[in-house]
Regions:
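Eukaryote-biased intrinsically disordered, low-complexity acidic regions enriched in Ser/Thr/Pro
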Residues: 1-66
Length: 66
């Protein structure tokens, strides 16, 4: 099973690109946090508390399987 990380944008969940998805998966497996490149900018991702900060906006993130 493959896993996909998504973030909440209003009432929809948006998938991260493949590069960011792999980086977030690594952070999650390490119970860690850090900066991830996504959508042409840097986002801080806290994979333990399941949120990201991008352009001073905090968004919920979650891990899905497909």
């Amino acid at each position: 099973m493959a896993f996909r990380w998504v973030y909440q944008a209003g009432s929809i969940w948006v998938p991260f690109d493949d590069r960011a998805n792999a980086a977030i998966e690594n952070l999650w497996r390490a119970c860690s946090h850090g900066n991830v490149y996504h959508a042409g900018t840097v986002a801080y991702v806290n994979a333990v508390n399941l949120y990201m900060l991008q352009d001073n906006v905090r968004r919920a993130i979650t891990r899905t399987g497909y």
